[in-house]
């Protein structure tokens, strides 16, 4: 169903409203004082009667301050007929009129620069073009409205988008925490709602390191929001890596645009390969924090830190901030299950070593997306280095009932094999 001129015309109706006739020089004061009383979309006729419409019914008394304004400025109350329609209505008002009673107007949409995207339900899909056009018309700052077609079924976490209204362009500039991020929403993973989570971890890293000598290994960096922000906020040094070549392109652009070339080093390779190259001294980066924001897969990469001391000779062990899913009815069960998954890669890990456990969101009643912060344990760091055979992400219990919003999900993942020297 598309929004046509006929549909717009069907929303028009004529109704009586109270109007006030006043001198031209009073109009600005009236508009400022009684903005909430003004009938939506009303216009005054400066050359004719200088009429300003107000949205008060005849049965209701006029507000006292409005009565005083009328008296003090010798205004006259008039009754007028006005034609109202699509242009006078809000997004919700239009869709309440046009959608069937069993279909709710979607309220949950994300704004990315001048792009708005929905995750429409099955009931809403027949009306997707109508919904998209109404949203575009009622939000003048938007240029593109789209819908994500399905869950993220590729290793790069990029969405499949359907244009609903506006320009077929997904380039965007997003301001966040003092940086400007350039991206193409169709080619890279982006979630605006992770802003506060990045803020939380940056503050926690500052607390752990007393705000000094912070060196972050950002293994799944996307277009670089975390690395750029912590570089700006805490003067941190960052090694920012992502497997997606498109992310790497925008990462480079964002580093230059935000003038952090001396603080953020970009990479485009598999996360394990990055760590192995550091061990082999092919990459010179002495990190003290590891940021692993890839919830479906990040825990599977923890085994690369087994034997850290053996491979690097360093006794100062890094802090690790890793994201993943867990199931449980309370925090204790969630932590226990999360910990058991970590132990598969780091056999010396114990849940008593957890420094901070944070729930980002509920996926289902029992399943949560979580972030766990801990310091690499001495036993794992000093044990013999060796990668662990990883569970198949497609058969994992954590993939069985995935109902997470599409922007936070990867189902089919590729665990790239890296040759160990």
Curated annotation (Swiss-Prot):
Cytoplasm recorded as keyword: yes
Enzyme Commission code(s) on record: 2.1.1.228
Species this chain originates from: Paramecium tetraurelia
Biological role stated in the UniProt entry: Specifically methylates the N1 position of guanosine-37 in various cytoplasmic and mitochondrial tRNAs. Methylation is not dependent on the nature of the nucleoside 5' of the target nucleoside. This is the first step in the biosynthesis of wybutosine (yW), a modified base adjacent to the anticodon of tRNAs and required for accurate decoding.
PANTHER family from the UniProt entry: TRNA (GUANINE(37)-N1)-METHYLTRANSFERASE 2, TRNA METHYLTRANSFERASE
GO cellular component: cytoplasm; mitochondrial matrix; nucleus
Binding residues annotated for S-adenosyl-L-methionine, in chain numbering: 198, 242-243, 270-271, 293
GO biological process annotation, one example: tRNA N1-guanine methylation
Catalytic activity: guanosine(37) in tRNA + S-adenosyl-L-methionine = N(1)-methylguanosine(37) in tRNA + S-adenosyl-L-homocysteine + H(+)
Family matches, as PROSITE patterns: SAM_MT_TRM5_TYW2
InterPro entries the UniProt entry points to: MeTrfase_TRM5/TYW2 (IPR030382), SAM-dependent_MTases_sf (IPR029063), TRM5-TYW2-like_MTfase (IPR056743), TRM5/TYW2-like_N (IPR056744), tRNA_Gua_MeTrfase_euk (IPR025792)
UniProt keyword terms in alphabetical order: Cytoplasm, Methyltransferase, Mitochondrion, Nucleus, S-adenosyl-L-methionine, Transferase, tRNA processing
Assembly, per entry: Monomer.
Statement: the UniProt record of this protein carries the keyword Transport: no
GO MF term list: tRNA (guanine(37)-N1)-methyltransferase activity; tRNA methyltransferase activity
Similarity section: Belongs to the class I-like SAM-binding methyltransferase superfamily. TRM5/TYW2 family.
SUPFAM superfamilies, per the entry: S-adenosyl-L-methionine-dependent methyltransferases
Location relative to the cell: Mitochondrion matrix; Nucleus; Cytoplasm
Name of the protein this chain belongs to: tRNA (guanine(37)-N(1))-methyltransferase
Class of this enzyme: transferase
